[in-house]
């Protein structure tokens, strides 16, 4: 793939645009902070999902589809989840209530991101499946003098790391001088943060050398990125709001545990989003979830297709703030209406589109080039495949897969049979159907109808 352009990415760590050089061209590794599954994702959460999906597509284009590993985590242990579970299911044991909340929210997130045209990440680890890895990192930090026990908690000792604060450009003296609240008496320094805390009897918890407890927020991502991508990997992404304290503390934990100079070589952050000129908040009445935008008339008195939301996001450079509005959605919809339907065939993306995206994901220029290509394709059908390949690189033209109606009907019948087996709790036979379909290139996605709570299953030809 040597003819592809040189990727240039803005690195928050160095505050400059750099030539991207992967550690291993055979396995380019990307980690993005995913959702905390206590509530449906809002349209601000849609932005990193879309932005880093474009990066994932671009990396696959440059290095090959089988040479990129994209990990996006699911945070399914958090005090916000506990609070939501108690609120929504007061009559149930807390662990059962938590399971209902996290399953419903995670399923909806997958449905939302699929509707937005996002490819499925290579791995989507859950925090609760990686507790052992978190405990192992904490043990290393204690052994190396970077963490301590106090008042039922294990805390990271920020003063033990000489260059703590590199990502956010904050130093410990500034944090101490700027503290507005009294420092917890058990902390050595104001910036020290929780790695592990004890759980009450009714709270979720796991056995550890420090007692039955649960992890702090930051340690979760250090454990999952390390497990699936290694001690040092290529790119770490997320929203600007995560730079401090979350990403700063991830770096501190990972570097001090593994003895490395960096955690990730490049740190990328997407800008903030506001709605109709105001910060999005429930108190302002302009808080909108992805589900509400796609399925209800909450914004603009109508529903909006996922492709329209995606294009509306990409019409602004990812590092710039977005003012999300009905006007912007209408503009994106008008633009999409002018683009022809087309099959990719064996075509490659247009060089102008590819070069724009290689320049720090310049989707603004890429979309301008794509629109010019669409106009040319409307006049000359021979250009259609190149337009389609270029649009697919932005996730704006899903690949069409021709399938005989009889074959599709047969797949539908097997999916329905599996649902009946699941209802009968015959999980072994249900899994056989799922695995057979997967071997045939058919990916199943289980979910629940938000309105009825009934189990639903959709399928697609695996990309």
Curated annotation (Swiss-Prot):
The compartments listed are: Cytoplasm
GO terms under biological process: cysteinyl-tRNA aminoacylation
Q: Which GO terms describe its molecular function?
A: ATP binding; cysteine-tRNA ligase activity; zinc ion binding
Q: Which UniProt keywords apply?
A: Aminoacyl-tRNA synthetase, ATP-binding, Cytoplasm, Ligase, Metal-binding, Nucleotide-binding, Protein biosynthesis, Zinc
The record lists the organism as Rhizobium rhizogenes (strain K84 / ATCC BAA-868) (Agrobacterium radiobacter)
Q: How does it assemble?
A: Monomer.
Q: What is catalyzed by this enzyme?
A: tRNA(Cys) + L-cysteine + ATP = L-cysteinyl-tRNA(Cys) + AMP + diphosphate
Kindly provide the name given to this protein in its UniProt entry. Answer: Cysteine--tRNA ligase
Q: Gene Ontology terms, cellular component aspect? A: cytosol
Its domain of life?
Answer: Bacteria
Q: Where does Zn(2+) bind?
A: 33, 221, 246, 250
Where, by residue number, is the motif 'KMSKS' region?
279-283
Fetch the PANTHER family from UniProt: CYSTEINE--TRNA LIGASE, CYTOPLASMIC, CYSTEINYL-TRNA SYNTHETASE
């Amino acid at each position: 793939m040597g003819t592809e352009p040189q990727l240039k990415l803005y690195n928050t760590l160095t505050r400059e645009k750099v030539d991207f050089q992967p550690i291993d061209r055979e396995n380019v590794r990307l980690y993005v902070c995913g959702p905390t599954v206590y509530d449906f994702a809002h349209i601000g959460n849609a932005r990193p999902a879309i932005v880093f999906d474009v990066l994932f597509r671009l990396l696959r284009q440059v290095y090959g589809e089988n040479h990129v590993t994209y990990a996006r985590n699911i945070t399914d242990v958090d005090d916000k989840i506990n609070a939501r579970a108690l609120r929504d299911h007061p009559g149930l044991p807390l662990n059962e209530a938590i399971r209902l909340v996290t399953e419903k929210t995670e399923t909806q997130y997958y449905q939302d991101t699929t509707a937005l045209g996002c490819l499925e990440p290579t791995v989507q680890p859950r925090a609760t499946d990686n507790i052992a890895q978190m405990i192992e990192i904490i043990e290393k930090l204690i052994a190396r003098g970077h963490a301590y026990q106090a008042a039922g908690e294990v805390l990271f000792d920020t003063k033990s790391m000489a260059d703590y604060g590199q990502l956010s450009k904050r130093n410990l003296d500034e944090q101490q001088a700027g503290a507005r609240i009294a420092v917890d008496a058990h902390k050595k320094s104001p910036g020290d943060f929780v790695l592990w805390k004890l759980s009450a009897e009714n709270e979720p918890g796991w056995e550890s050398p420090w007692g039955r407890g649960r992890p702090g927020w930051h340690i979760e991502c250090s454990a999952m990125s390390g497990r699936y991508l290694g001690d040092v990997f290529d790119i770490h992404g997320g929203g600007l709001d995560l730079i401090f304290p979350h990403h700063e503390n991830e770096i501190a934990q990972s570097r001090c545990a593994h003895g490395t100079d960096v955690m990730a070589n490049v740190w990328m952050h997407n800008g903030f989003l506001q709605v109709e000129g105001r910060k999005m908040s429930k108190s302002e009445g302009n808080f909108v979830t992805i589900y509400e935008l796609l399925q209800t008339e909450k914004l603009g008195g109508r529903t909006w297709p996922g492709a329209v939301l995606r294009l509306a996001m990409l019409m602004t450079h990812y590092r710039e703030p977005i003012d999300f509005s009905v006007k912007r959605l209408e503009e994106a919809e008008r633009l999409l209406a002018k683009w022809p339907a087309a099959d990719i065939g064996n075509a490659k993306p247009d060089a102008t589109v590819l070069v724009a995206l290689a320049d720090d994901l310049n989707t603004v220029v890429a979309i301008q080039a794509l629109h010019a290509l669409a106009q040319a394709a409307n006049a000359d059908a021979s250009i259609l495949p190149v337009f389609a390949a270029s649009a697919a690189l932005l996730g704006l033209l899903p690949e069409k897969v021709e399938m005989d109606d009889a074959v599709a009907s047969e797949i539908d019948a097997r999916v329905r049979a599996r649902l009946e087996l699941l209802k009968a709790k015959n999980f072994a036979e249900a899994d056989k159907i799922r695995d057979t379909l997967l071997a045939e290139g058919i990916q199943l996605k289980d979910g629940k109808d938000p309105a009825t709570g009934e189990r639903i299953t959709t399928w697609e030809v695996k990309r």
